[in-house]
């Protein structure tokens, strides 16, 4: 996608969301709030980070987060792109030009008491360079960050970059392991997607830790 197309698309999407502020979120564990300067692709530098404190030594905590967010993000895409006839207001819609040249119409779907809830979901999904390049639900946000020596799973979405055409770097541990999520369409005639989660070490040796199929 050219820079010109990107700017045009970015402008269209910016009309759909009220701001770059993340939604209020009440964590179950500890939280951290920080101010970020020069946040890429945002118009508001006062972006608040809220996250859940994780046990650095617990591999299962990282793995559970990955699978949980896969399900959450995939569900969000289906929710936003589905025709909710009982809740859609046809007068409240926005024509969106997709990166591949197609045009679609986004309707406001009342999924909560506040429109802000919907707008934030739209921002989370569409304000992502990976989505803009390939328009696929196969992505995760920046999952982890470290503040004052403590590891947090982030709720503000600064997006991870793809390692190759199909993979996204999730997290690199101190001892060198990293988690990769690869999304593979099972069948061109269906919307089924197989997410393969694998763990790599510093020698690029890997093991598949799970396969999650969604449709």
What are these regions (language model features)?
Residues 141-188:
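Surface-exposed, charged secondary-structure patches
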Residues 30, 144-146, 197:
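Assembly/interface hotspot detector across virion components, adhesins/toxins, and nucleic-acid enzymes
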Residues 20-28, 190-215:
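Short beta-strand edge/turn micro-motifs at domain boundaries
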Residues 2-7, 179-183, 190-197:
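Low-complexity, intrinsically disordered Gly/Pro/Thr-rich segments
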Residues 51-148:
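Core segments of small alpha/beta cavity-forming domains
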Residues 24-60:
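Intrinsically disordered, low-complexity repeat and linker tracts
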Residues 1-36:
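Surface-exposed amphipathic alpha-helical segments
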Residues 4, 28, 37-45, 176, ...:
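Intrinsic-disorder/low-complexity regions
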